[in-house]
C-alpha cells in the first residue's frame, strides 16, 4: 500500500481519539500518516496555504468551523482530498453524499468503516502510479502523467513537472495504471486521456 496522508478533524477530543484509533486498527501495515485537528479552520488554513497536503479527510460536520463548509471550500481547489464525514447526525446524509466520498455515523461501526476505508484505498491507488526510480520508490499522481513512450527496454514517462526514464515495458506500465484513463494508440505509447484536448 502506498503511503497516504490522512487528517482527522473533530472538536470533541474523545471522538477525535476514537476515529484515530479506528484508522490505526485499519492501518495494520503502517501505510498512513495521520494528523489530528480539533479545529476545521486550522485544517483549512493548512490546506489553502499548502503547509499540508492530505489524501483523505475524516471530518465531523458539527464543529465551530462547519464540516460541510470546509468540504465545499476544498472542492474548489485544483487537487483536493477525499472526504469522509463522520458525524452523529443521520439527517445530513443526503446532503453529505453530495460533497463527500462517504458518510459515516458515530459511534463508528467497524465493518462500515472498514468498507469505507477499503473504497478510499482503492480510489487513491487508482490515482497513483508507484515506480522504482534511481533506488527510491516514487508515487506519481496519474493526473500529472501526460504520456508514456517506449524506448527499447525502457519507458520514458512525460509528467507535468518532470520526465522519468524507467526500466520497464509499456504492458507492465499499463497493468499498474487505471485503464479508464490511459489508452494505447500505438504499441509504443500510453496516453493519459485526461490531457487530450478535443
PLM features: residue spans?
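Conserved beta-strand scaffold positions in the cores of enzyme catalytic domains, especially
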Residues: 34-36, 103, 182
Amino acid at each position: 500500500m502506498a503511503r497516504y496522508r490522512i487528517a482527522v478533524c473533530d472538536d470533541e477530543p474523545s471522538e477525535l481519539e476514537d476515529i484515530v484509533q479506528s484508522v490505526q486498527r485499519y492501518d495494520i501495515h503502517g501505510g498512513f500518516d495521520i494528523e489530528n485537528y480539533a479545529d476545521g479552520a486550522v485544517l483549512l488554513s493548512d490546506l489553502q496555504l499548502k503547509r499540508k497536503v492530505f489524501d483523505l479527510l475524516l471530518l465531523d460536520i458539527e464543529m465551530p468551523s462547519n464540516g460541510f463548509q470546509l468540504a465545499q471550500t476544498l472542492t474548489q481547489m485544483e487537487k483536493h482530498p477525499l472526504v469522509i464525514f463522520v458525524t452523529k447526525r443521520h439527517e445530513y446524509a443526503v446532503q453529505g453524499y453530495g460533497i463527500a466520498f462517504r458518510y459515516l455515523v458515530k459511534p463508528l461501526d467497524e465493518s462500515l468503516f472498514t468498507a469505507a476505508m477499503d473504497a478510499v484505498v482503492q480510489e487513491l491507488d487508482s490515482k497513483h502510479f508507484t515506480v522504482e526510480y534511481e533506488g527510491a520508490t516514487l508515487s506519481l499522481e496519474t493526473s500529472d502523467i501526460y504520456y508514456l513512450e517506449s524506448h527499447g527496454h525502457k519507458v520514458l514517462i512525460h509528467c507535468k513537472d518532470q520526465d522519468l526514464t524507467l526500466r520497464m515495458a509499456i504492458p507492465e506500465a499499463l497493468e499498474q495504471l487505471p485503464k479508464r484513463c490511459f489508452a494505447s494508440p500505438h504499441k509504443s505509447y500510453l496516453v493519459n486521456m485526461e490531457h487530450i484536448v478535443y
